[in-house]
Regions:
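Short beta-rich binding modules
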Residues: 1-191
Length: 191
C-alpha cells in the first residue's frame, strides 16, 4: 500500500449528526446588529443535542478552516420599506417580548437597547426541515422557525411545521431520472 506524505496532519472526518426537526431549549449567546437584521446567536442548551451548534462549528472548522460558519443564528429582519414590513415587525416584537417575559428582563425595546442584555436568555425554539441544493449536494437541514415559551416546550404544546421545500424541487424523482439500471442477479459481479 502507498503512503502519502501529509498523513499525520490530515484531518479525519468526524460524525456529522443531523439535528432533527422539533423544538429545543436554546440559550442566546449574543445579539448582533447586522445591517438588515438583528441576529440572535444561540445554541441548544439541554438534552441529547446540547451544544449542537458549537460542536458542529468546531467540526466544520477542522474540515473547512477558511469557510466554516456558526449555524446557530436566528435572523429577525428589520423593516425595509416594502410589503413584508408588517410581518417583520410582528415577528420581531413577538420574539423579543417572549425573551423578555421568559427571562424577566427589564428592557424597553421601543428605545435603543444593548443586545448584550439578551446574553444567557433561555427560550424554546422550533426548527423545521428546509430543503437545500448546495455545491451538488441535496438534502434537508433543520432551520429555526419560531420561538415558544419554556412551558410550551415542557408540555409539548407546539406544532412542528411541514418541511420547506425548494420551489423547483422534485424531491421524489421518478426512476428514469435516477439513471439506475437493473442488475441481473444471475450474472457474475464485475469484481
Amino acid at each position: 500500500m502507498r503512503a502519502f506524505t501529509d498523513y499525520e496532519s490530515t484531518q479525519e472526518f468526524t460524525e456529522n449528526i443531523r439535528l432533527p426537526a422539533g423544538a429545543y431549549e436554546v440559550t442566546i449567546k449574543s445579539a448582533e446588529d447586522n445591517d438588515d437584521a438583528l441576529c440572535l446567536l444561540f445554541d441548544s442548551s439541554a438534552g441529547e443535542y446540547r451544544d449542537y451548534f458549537m460542536n458542529k462549528f468546531r467540526n466544520d472548522k477542522n474540515i473547512y478552516p477558511d469557510t466554516a460558519k456558526f449555524k446557530g443564528v436566528y435572523r429577525l429582519w428589520y423593516p425595509k420599506g416594502n410589503e413584508s414590513d408588517e410581518t417583520n415587525k410582528m415577528r420581531m416584537k413577538t420574539v423579543l417580548k417572549l425573551i423578555k417575559e421568559e427571562n424577566k428582563l427589564n428592557i424597553d425595546y421601543s428605545k435603543e437597547w444593548d443586545g448584550a442584555a439578551l446574553k444567557g436568555s433561555r427560550i424554546g425554539m422550533i426548527f423545521r426541515d428546509q430543503e437545500y441544493h448546495y455545491n451538488g449536494y441535496h438534502g434537508f437541514t433543520a432551520q429555526p422557525y419560531g420561538v415558544i415559551s419554556m412551558e410550551a416546550l415542557r408540555t409539548g404544546k407546539y406544532t412542528v411545521p411541514e418541511p420547506k421545500r425548494l420551489n423547483d424541487s422534485d424531491s421524489f424523482p421518478d426512476s428514469e431520472k435516477l439513471r439506475f439500471f437493473e442488475i441481473n442477479v444471475e450474472d457474475d459481479l464485475p469484481f
